Amino acid sequence: MNEREKLEQAIATAKEIHKRQKYSRIDFYDPYPFQKNFHDTGFENNQRLLMCANRIGKSYCGAAEMAMHLTGLYPDWWQGRKYRKAITAWVGGVSNESTRDICQAELLGPPEDPEAWGTGAIPKDCIVSSERKPGVPNAKSLGLIKHISGSNSTVHFKSYESGVEKWM
């Protein structure tokens, strides 16, 4: 292999690595100790609270765990609860807009950029489909996610401002 071929191969490899990091972000999740502790306690506790300072990874920590449960793809270090079958899950925020801008973005990718679909915690190749939320630009009401069991998990995006009747 000559120098040019080696360089072309190195460039192709770098592009593939970048693509995998972009569209399989969860594969590169390396939690901080407080995040790992949060995940681990899920084995014994149905309800947990992750209360920390701003901008240190709470949202992505929750999105990473939700992505693992929706897909059934767990890393080797995982000690928390595991779902071997597809699940139905609810993800909620204060408003439709905050649910879209935080929860949906962390799970699926930035809502305003169609090219970024699949750059969130859920790998692009696991996103089967989604349904648009009426009246909220770029927001989804649900996502269908491929689970390793062969079935599809469903994630519903909800907001607290919609009232309790929307949660029942």
Model-derived regions, located:
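Phosphate/NTP-binding elements of NTP-utilizing enzymes
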Residues: 1-168
